[in-house]
Structures are given as C-alpha cells and as structure tokens.
C-alpha cells in the first residue's frame, strides 16, 4: 500500500515539475508590454488591425493581444495620460458592445490579482461564448490598465477547457517602461 502512495506522489511531483520547467519565451508587445508563452507557440501580426496573435501548434486556442497608449484631451488644448478609471470605462464599453446571440450575457470573471507582476494596475475580465460559422466559440476578454495604457488580451477556442487553462499566461504579463 505504501508503494502505491509513493508511486502516486512521484507521478504527481513529476507532472508538477514538467509544468514548472516548461520552456517559455518572452514575447514583446507594443508599448513596452511583454507576455511569456510556451516556446513552441507561433506568433503572427494581424496586418489589418495590428493585433498580436499567438497560438500553439495543433490546437484550437488563439490569443489576440492589442496595446493602446491613450491620452485625454484637456480644455487648454493640452493632453494628459488617460486615467485607469477612464481606460476601464472604455474597456467595459467595448466589451459590452460585442454582439452575442440567444440573449447571452457577458459574465465578469475574477482573477487573483496577487499573482500579477504589474504595479498600479486595474484588471477586468469577461467571459462569453458565441457562434462563428456554426461553431461555438468560448472566449475570455481581459483588459489590463495602467495610467495611459490599455492592454487587451482575448483568449478564444472551441474548447472551454483550453481557454480556462490558457488564462494562466496572463499572470506573466509585464509592463517594462
């Protein structure tokens, strides 16, 4: 009996070790943002809307990332960096404009903010599903806001488990400057 427990413990430790030493690559995003993803992931740049697109080989999962540097106009024709609250409001409006059918509603998703490496930020995430070409797609859209900067990360897949597993990569996001 003790041998079975020991074997199970070794198997569990082996799985954890394999995950923790997964080879990762730091990908640069516009405006000083970075994200770490597995080294074998493919990076593309959408030529139309300039999104960064990341996906693993042989998977339905896609991550689309957009970065914005946003200023707020003042009455005296000057401008200041947009506040975190202004950016949060803009992100909320953009996500809530996503057209969902069948009276579906966006649901706010809570993440553990203690796991982030970013200072002075706000995070909002929403999860939803929709149909594209008669195929159900599950998505989580996250906005990370710091003063003057908004990073939007969208996770998409036909498989809900893939998206929920990939959300862990958001904790590797850093703002360099």
Regions found by a protein language model. Give the residues of each.
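Conserved polar/disulfide-associated segments of primarily extracytoplasmic proteins
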Residues: 48-140
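A short, solvent-exposed beta-edge/loop patch
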Residues: 139-149
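Bacterial Sec-dependent signal peptides at the C-terminal "C-region" and cleavage site
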Residues: 14-22
